[in-house]
Regions:
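Short S/T/G/P-rich N-terminal loop/turn motif that feeds into the first structured element of a domain
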Residues: 1-54, 61-67, 71, 94-96
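Generic beta-strand structural signal
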Residues: 54-56, 88-89
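C-terminal structural segments of small proteins and small subunits
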Residues: 63-91
Length: 96
């Protein structure tokens, strides 16, 4: 079953640093066979308190592979670029 990392962006505080994160992280995503299903800044809240300004959905072969990617030394080496440049959050979900 596939696994997914879903990330939300609420504000990009430093666009240049965030662009550098995207560039730096791309090799890690590729190494783990990630498939970007959605990368959108067009978000409209229908109900509730969830109001991200952007949503990213990335598919991996399995939940375990998605977790392995996130925990990998390669991704952990660049994750602070995202954390420091954008107000964001990420979760991993099982596609079952």
């Amino acid at each position: 079953m596939p696994g997914y990392i879903i990330a939300t962006l609420n504000n990009i505080n430093d666009p240049d640093a965030f662009a550098q994160y995207q560039k730096s992280a791309s090799a890690s995503f590729a190494q783990y066979g990630a498939k970007f299903l959605l990368n959108s800044r067009s978000v409209e809240t229908l109900d509730g308190d969830w109001q991200p300004s952007g949503v990213v959905v990335v598919e991996f072969e399995s939940f375990e592979l998605a977790k392995n990617f996130y925990d990998s030394p390669e991704y952990q080496a660049v994750i602070n670029q995202r954390i420091n440049s954008a107000d964001s959050a990420a979760i991993v979900v099982d596609g079952a």
